[in-house]
């Protein structure tokens, strides 16, 4: 599964919720953690910041692991679209993509975020907030946080 969206769309939050109560490993290309040995440690592998995977060696390790382990599940998070070297998996249907437009919050989800911060604005305020934020998760969360701190809504 490949999630791609700009910063603040909740890719990591969605992945954490998806993998809740599952045994998995979390790897990052920035720290050089993507090795053949690391990829063998669990049946579910989460790799965040895929857009930073510049090492050909890491790419080859990941490709080999995907090809040789059909039972293994990969959750890949990125700020950019599926790179060319992963396209064969997408075209064949083995790699499901979740794009940014699927991560926008609905009006009811926006209201739920506010409730999780211990505040429940009125129906008109929620509608106004939803229109202003377009359901962008980071904007909704920051607004909910500020309102929960008793900052006046403007």
Predicted features and spans:
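P-loop NTPase Walker A phosphate-binding motif
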Residues: 6-25
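Conserved P-loop NTPase "ATPase switch" module shared by AAA+ and STAND
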Residues: 37-58, 77
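Sensor-1/coupling segment of RecA-like P-loop NTPase cores
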Residues: 52, 64-90
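Conserved catalytic segments around the Walker B and adjacent sensor/switch elements
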Residues: 20-34, 43
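Amphipathic alpha-helical "lid/sensor" segments that cap RecA-like P-loop NTPase cores
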Residues: 8, 13, 97, 115-154
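A short helix-turn-beta junction within AAA+ P-loop NTPase domains corresponding to the substrate/partner-engaging
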Residues: 88-102
